[in-house]
Every structure is written in structure tokens, then in C-alpha cells.
Amino acid sequence: MPIQLIFSFNFNKYFQVISSIGGRYILIAGGVFLFFYVVFKNKVLAKKIQNALPKNKDYLREFVYSISTILIFGLIILNIIGNPAVRPHTKIYDDIAEYGWLYYFAVFPVMLIIHDTYFYWTHRIMHHKSIFKIFHLVHHQSTNPSPWAAYAFHPMEAIVENGIFIVFAFLFPLHKSNLPIFFLFSILYNVYGHLGWELYPKGFNKSIVGKWVNTSVCHNQHHKYFKGNYGLYLLFWDRLMGTLRNDYDIAFEEVKSR
């Protein structure tokens, strides 16, 4: 089999892909970091989920691993959408009229549910003691995460995390713009999850909708204690599988009472 069938590399296209991913990440994570950790740090510190701030070496480690993740994400994406031997076999289409606007918008909640399910189960698998140190320990070095922890993955975990792009590309029809729009939302929520501050209002965790939604407090607990709270966007799987920490509601209420 010709090598181009399984691997395609064009530096100009690769640079475009990583610039798009990296630019989006640095703008969002960097902007939020600047707001909470630099400019208004003293004004909002009392409301931080964990009282202490990470150390400078933690920020540096998270940033370096984030850059590594961006490079890996770019390579995988390029070899799907930029490889002429692979792209025709994907479900990605160009003309919205092919499936219509209703379908175009309807796929977004489906993508969210699929990604949340993919994340929950791959996350739990990576917590298995036989592979945790190889795949997931790097991410858990951030026991008090900052926004830069959102992409702070070991290269092996980065491949697993980007596997959802492969699932989407081959599972069901998606317009070429569905993917960047969804992943823009994804990184926004990922950065929020690692923010270190809770943005949802007091009582949200016990509301009809909020009890099913993952929060920054919830994911911060996961980083602090390593066990429980494995979801990404939702708490459906955590509640169904009994992996939501028993002290989650108490922690949420304590943070929001400050």
C-alpha cells in the first residue's frame, strides 16, 4: 500500500491546521488566564475553588504539554481531512443543501452526547492502574488546574482525546463546518472545566437542568482527588454509573457561598 494512503504530510497545510487549533486555544485559554490569574487575580481569589494558586512551573508544564497536544491534534486531523486518499471515505460533506439546515443544527446535540460518552469511558479506562501512568498521569499532575491544563496531555492521551475526531469523521454525515464549530464549543467548555473558578450560579447544581451538567467544581474535584467525576459536558454517566462524588453538592455550595 502506498504510504500516502495511510499518511499524508504537507507542511503548509499542517501549519494552517495547527495555527487554527493553537490560535483558538491560546486566545481562549490565554484570555481567560489573563483575566482570572493576572489582571483581576486579587479581586477574585477569595472565590477560587482551591484557595491556592498553581506555581509558575505548573503553568509552564501545562503550556508545554498543550503545545505538544496541538501538534498531535494537527497531524491526526490533517491525515483525515487533508489526505486525498482518506477524505473521500469520510462522512464529511461540503454542501449544506445535501442534508438541509434542520439536519445541520440537529447534529450538534448528537455530537455532544457522543463526545461526552466517548470521553467518560476512555477517561475511566485511562484511570486503570495498568495504564494510568502511561496515558493520564501527566494531566493529573495538575492537581490544582489552570486553564492551560485543558490540553495538557501526554502524547499518548492526546491521541486518545483526538480519537473523537476520527469517530465523527466516519460515523455519520457532518458538514465540514460542524466540526470546527463543535470543537470551538468543546475547548470553551474544557477551559471552563479547568478554570479554577465556578461560573454557574448558586443552586445550579441542584436545578432540573444543572444536576445533569458538569461544572468547574465537579471537574476540579476530579483533579484534586483523582477518583470520581469522570464526565466532560454532562453528569449523566457519572450519575448512572455511581461515580459522582458524594461530596460534590457540598463542595459546589461551599464555593458559591463565599
Language-model-derived ranges and their functions:
Residues 1-26, 30, 38-41, 46-56, ...:
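Cytosolic/stromal cytosol-facing helical appendages immediately following the last transmembrane segment
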Residues 85-91, 118-135, 196-204:
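Juxtamembrane/interfacial segments flanking transmembrane helices
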Residues 76-114:
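Juxtamembrane helix-loop-helix connectors linking adjacent transmembrane helices
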Residues 23-36, 67-83, 109-112, 162-167:
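Hydrophobic alpha-helical transmembrane segments of multi-pass integral membrane proteins
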Residues 18-19, 105, 109, 121-122, ...:
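Hydrophobic alpha-helical transmembrane segments of multi-pass membrane proteins
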Residues 111, 115, 119, 214:
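Active-site alpha-helix of zinc metalloproteases
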Residues 42-51, 80-92, 128:
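Membrane-helix interface/capping segments
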Residues 48-70, 93-104:
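Interfacial transmembrane-helix boundary/kink motif in multi-pass membrane proteins
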